[in-house]
């Protein structure tokens, strides 16, 4: 059953050239769905639209069957949808702990709930507990990405939207991120990601969507794409 879905989305920046053209998408609950395609295909634009950062010119977005098209961004955290952008979103002059606390504003002043949520994230990512008093700007790139993902999980979302979560990371750290996605799936959390490490993302995904030039090119399960993915990627590079 689809937990988040979009139908016939057309999206542009500043009302000019359409970046997404009649794109449809759905992600099943408790599954990993990956959006792949060549540069400029509209992958990140789709994630931003699903999270309400961009308003579609046409089309509908639904979460658990209810329309969330045009919902204000600050309300998305209350719906159970989290988003980690491609560009770094940490506050470098704040400590790891302070960065995490910023992700708990929904709990208001319930200190016990805040502490419990942060402890759970630090248990999932021990490095965050070890570095909790360290300024975030002093962390490695991989540790900063772990901090961003950890912060997104503080509210126990139903859906995590991850834009290029392994970009520029060392293979060892990227593998840790992929393992985290599999762990989230085991906890019935839906993961929707954009990723350029196609082979590795393919291996952990249940379903894939391929975008080209802002349009749906193909979609299917990992097994349905076995054998054809290599040729498809080769076509993007020529």
Predicted features and spans:
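The feature captures the beta-strand-to-loop junction immediately N-terminal to the Walker
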Residues: 36-38
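A short, flexible loop at the N-terminus of ABC-type nucleotide-binding domains that lies
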Residues: 1-3, 10-22, 72-73
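C-terminal boundary and immediately downstream tail of ABC-type ATPase nucleotide-binding domains
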Residues: 204-219, 226-238
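Helix-to-loop junction immediately C-terminal to a conserved catalytic motif
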Residues: 51
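Conserved ABC transporter NBD signature motif
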Residues: 59-68, 79, 113-118, 220
């Amino acid at each position: 059953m689809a937990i988040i879905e979009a139908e016939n989305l057309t999206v542009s920046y500043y009302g000019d050239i359409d970046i997404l053209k009649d794109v449809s998408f759905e992600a099943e609950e408790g599954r990993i769905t990956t959006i792949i395609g060549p540069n400029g295909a509209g992958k990140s634009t789709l994630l931003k639209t699903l999270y309400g950062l961009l308003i579609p010119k046409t089309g509908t977005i639904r979460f658990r069957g209810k329309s969330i098209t045009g919902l204000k961004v600050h309300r998305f955290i209350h719906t159970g949808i989290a988003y980690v952008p491609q560009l770094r979103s940490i506050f470098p002059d704040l400590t790891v702990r302070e960065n995490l606390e910023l992700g708990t504003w929904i709990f208001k002043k319930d200190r016990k709930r805040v502490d419990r949520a942060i402890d759970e994230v630090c248990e999932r990512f021990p490095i965050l507990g070890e570095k909790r008093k360290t300024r975030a700007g002093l962390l490695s790139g991989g540790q900063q990405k772990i901090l961003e993902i950890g912060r997104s999980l503080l509210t126990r979302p139903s859906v995590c939207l991850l834009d290029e979560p392994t970009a520029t990371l060392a293979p060892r750290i990227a593998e840790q991120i992929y393992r985290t996605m599999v762990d989230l799936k085991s906890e019935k959390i839906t993961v929707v990601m954009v990723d350029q490490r196609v082979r590795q993302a393919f291996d952990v995904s249940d379903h894939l969507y391929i975008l080209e030039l802002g349009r749906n090119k193909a979609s299917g399960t990992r097994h349905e794409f076995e054998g054809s993915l290599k040729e498809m990627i080769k076509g993007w590079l020529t």
